[in-house]
């Protein structure tokens, strides 16, 4: 059966991996997933990621991050879903936890955090929220 929301699947794998205290999780590779992981790494929510091409299908190995035994990501949720896309202008981008969290946005300038999108004055599809 085909996967209807690949990005949502990756976020769920990250959430489940952190709840199970895993060091890393695997997710099928795609450009969008890699760009979202770059934002998470820049913002300090994951240690890093690498592409594993040893198998038939490329996989992304996501290195999870913990702080004093607690997951760095307390909450991760998909905002724009396949059945209901959510778009926002640069001035209307949601602020998560009074700026303590981030919103990941797909813009014409690439996948950015909400702060980067505001600084570049671009809006786009609101992919996920993380704190």
UniProtKB/Swiss-Prot annotation:
<dbReference type="GO" id="GO:1990904">
    <property type="term" value="C:ribonucleoprotein complex"/>
</dbReference>
<dbReference type="Pfam" id="PF00410">
    <property type="entry name" value="Ribosomal_S8"/>
</dbReference>
<dbReference type="GO" id="GO:0019843">
    <property type="term" value="F:rRNA binding"/>
</dbReference>
<keyword id="KW-0689">Ribosomal protein</keyword>
<keyword id="KW-0694">RNA-binding</keyword>
<protein>
    <recommendedName>
        <fullName>Small ribosomal subunit protein uS8</fullName>
    </recommendedName>
</protein>
<comment type="function">
    <text>One of the primary rRNA binding proteins, it binds directly to 16S rRNA central domain where it helps coordinate assembly of the platform of the 30S subunit.</text>
</comment>
<keyword id="KW-0699">rRNA-binding</keyword>
<comment type="subunit">
    <text>Part of the 30S ribosomal subunit. Contacts proteins S5 and S12.</text>
</comment>
<dbReference type="GO" id="GO:0005840">
    <property type="term" value="C:ribosome"/>
</dbReference>
<dbReference type="InterPro" id="IPR035987">
    <property type="entry name" value="Ribosomal_uS8_sf"/>
</dbReference>
<dbReference type="InterPro" id="IPR000630">
    <property type="entry name" value="Ribosomal_uS8"/>
</dbReference>
<keyword id="KW-0687">Ribonucleoprotein</keyword>
<dbReference type="GO" id="GO:0003735">
    <property type="term" value="F:structural constituent of ribosome"/>
</dbReference>
<dbReference type="InterPro" id="IPR047863">
    <property type="entry name" value="Ribosomal_uS8_CS"/>
</dbReference>
<comment type="similarity">
    <text>Belongs to the universal ribosomal protein uS8 family.</text>
</comment>
<dbReference type="GO" id="GO:0006412">
    <property type="term" value="P:translation"/>
</dbReference>
